[in-house]
C-alpha cells in the first residue's frame, strides 16, 4: 500500500544549517587560537568529477573561513612525490585536515597513501586507526558520508533503536562504516552486496534502507517495505533526454510513494558529506589545540 505522506530528507538545507553553526565556531576558535583551521586537499590528474568536488570543497572553505591548501598533481606524479607532500602537510602546524581526493590513477596505491596521513588529520576518516576507533566506539574522525547519513536521520528524528536497517554495499568508504554507526545506534543491521541471493527479499524487511552501490535504479518500489526510510548514497551520471544528469541507486519516483522519508539525488546525502568534512576539520582544529583526541 503506497505511503502518501513521504517526505524528502533535505540534505541541502541541513548542510546550510551545519555550515552556519561551523562558521560561528570557527570565529570563536580563531579568536582563541590565533589562526583559522586549515584543510589540505590533494588531487591527482584532471578527472572532471574530482575537479568539481574539489572546487566545491574549496568554495565551502572560503565561505566558512577555513584556510585551503590545494595541491594539484599531474596524472603521472609518482607515489613518492605524493607521499612526501603528505608528510610535509603532516608536519605543517597550519594544517588540521588532509584529504586525498579519490579515485587516484591506477599506478598510485590509494590505500598505502591514506596510511601515510597523520590519523589526527585524517578528515576523511579512512585511516585504519580512525576506523578502529569507530569499531571500538571511541571518539575520533568519522568517514564523512556515513556520518552525514547518521546526521540526516537524527535531524528528522528517526529513532533507530530497535529498527531493522539494511545496508546495500560493503565498501570501506560507506557500507562498512555506516553499518557500524547504525549498530552503535542500536539498530539491527543486515549488510547486502553483490553476492546476496534474492536482494529484494532482504530489502523488503528494512525499516531503514541505505543504498550505497553506484548502480542507477537498483532499488525499485517492489523492493521497499511500505513506510520505510530510504537513504540513497549512490550517485552516477546518466544521459537523460540528451543531458547528463545525476541519479542515485534508487528509482526515485516510484520509491518515493512507498517510503515515509527519502533522500533525493542530488540534494540529499551529497551536501551533508561536504559539511561533515568541514566539521571534521573544525573538530581536528579544536582537538589539536586542546592536545587531546579522546573527547
Swiss-Prot record:
GO terms for molecular function: methenyltetrahydrofolate cyclohydrolase activity; methylenetetrahydrofolate dehydrogenase (NADP+) activity. CDD domains: NAD_bind_m-THF_DH_Cyclohyd (cd01080). One of its GO terms (cellular component) is cytosol. It comes from the Bacteria. NADP(+) binds at residues 169-171, 194, 235. Its EC number is 1.5.1.5, 3.5.4.9. Pathway: One-carbon metabolism; tetrahydrofolate interconversion. GO terms for biological process: L-histidine biosynthetic process; methionine biosynthetic process; purine nucleotide biosynthetic process; tetrahydrofolate interconversion. Keywords: Amino-acid biosynthesis, Histidine biosynthesis, Hydrolase, Methionine biosynthesis, Multifunctional enzyme, NADP, One-carbon metabolism, Oxidoreductase, Purine biosynthesis. The keyword Amino-acid biosynthesis applies. Gene3D superfamilies: Leucine Dehydrogenase, chain A, domain 1, NAD(P)-binding Rossmann-like Domain. The keyword Nucleotide-binding does not apply. Pfam families: THF_DHG_CYH (PF00763), THF_DHG_CYH_C (PF02882). It catalyses: (6R)-5,10-methylene-5,6,7,8-tetrahydrofolate + NADP(+) = (6R)-5,10-methenyltetrahydrofolate + NADPH; (6R)-5,10-methenyltetrahydrofolate + H2O = (6R)-10-formyltetrahydrofolate + H(+). InterPro entries: Aminoacid_DH-like_N_sf, NAD(P)-bd_dom_sf, THF_DH/CycHdrlase, THF_DH/CycHdrlase_cat_dom, THF_DH/CycHdrlase_CS, THF_DH/CycHdrlase_NAD-bd_dom. Homodimer. Catalyzes the oxidation of 5,10-methylenetetrahydrofolate to 5,10-methenyltetrahydrofolate and then the hydrolysis of 5,10-methenyltetrahydrofolate to 10-formyltetrahydrofolate. Belongs to the tetrahydrofolate dehydrogenase/cyclohydrolase family. This is Bifunctional protein FolD. The gene is folD.
